[in-house]
Amino acid sequence: MAEKKAEKRAEKRKFNTEAWEPKTQIGRMVKEGTISDINYIMDKGLPLLEPEIVDALLPDLEEQVLDVKLVQRMHKSGRRARYRATVVVGNKNGYVGVGMGKSKEVGPAIRKAIAHAKLSLIKVRVGCGSWECGCGSPHSIPFTAKGACGSVKVELLPAPRGVGLVAGNVAKAVLGLAGIKDAWTKTFGDTRTTYNFAEATFDALNNLNFVRCLPAQKEKLGLTEGRVL
């Protein structure tokens, strides 16, 4: 019974390309089949302006709600309350995104956060950078990376196979959906702020993409960008 319900939910989540009416040139090219790989868009630096592009090119994307909070701001008519949702999306195979959405209701806030996370999607570099392992398979990160958001700072370190994700629940969710299986983390600042913690972890993963490597180093580290075949 539970399996049937899960299958029905999966069918509802399936993206209907035929019903989609793209609003941008890239969206039209994706619908026509001219662009069939999301790596082409990312490598060319083309802007992702429609979340439906990600739905069409990455159908195996998963979503996880990290936090939903009631936030308030002062107005001349009094306090105004809204819900703020933090969401992480990823396919557990080299792609991840983090987003935040606000609305007067929980549902629209989560949907906005999911759309924002899809538009912030990045490729993640994976490999084996731990001196204790050296297996060359893409189970960890290739080298140390740092990220920050607000007062929160996160440092990611490569770990040998079998260690798992030694991190807080928020960082563990982001790293897990990125496809990283083993990593150590160091955190500084007020990590109770879920969005800042998630964004700092996401920033650290993004900073992996700005390190230049020689072909020999890539081979030694087992460095892979994006989807691992």
Curated annotation (Swiss-Prot):
Coiled-coil zones: none
Keyword field: Ribonucleoprotein, Ribosomal protein, RNA-binding, rRNA-binding
Annotated S5 DRBM domain residues: 61-124
Organism superkingdom: Archaea
GO process terms (BP): translation
Cellular component annotations (GO), alphabetically ordered: cytosolic small ribosomal subunit
InterPro entries tied to this protein: Ribosomal_Su5_D2-typ_SF, Ribosomal_uS5, Ribosomal_uS5_arc, Ribosomal_uS5_C, Ribosomal_uS5_euk/arc, Ribosomal_uS5_N, Ribosomal_uS5_N_CS, Ribsml_uS5_D2-typ_fold_subgr
GO molecular function: rRNA binding; structural constituent of ribosome
Keyword set includes Transmembrane: no
Bilayer-spanning residue ranges: none
Cited SUPFAM superfamilies: dsRNA-binding domain-like (SSF54768), Ribosomal protein S5 domain 2-like (SSF54211)
Family label: Belongs to the universal ribosomal protein uS5 family.
Known partners and oligomeric status: Part of the 30S ribosomal subunit. Contacts protein S4.
Record text about domains: The N-terminal domain interacts with the head of the 30S subunit; the C-terminal domain interacts with the body and contacts protein S4. The interaction surface between S4 and S5 is involved in control of translational fidelity.
The protein's role, per its UniProt record: With S4 and S12 plays an important role in translational accuracy.
Protein known as: Small ribosomal subunit protein uS5
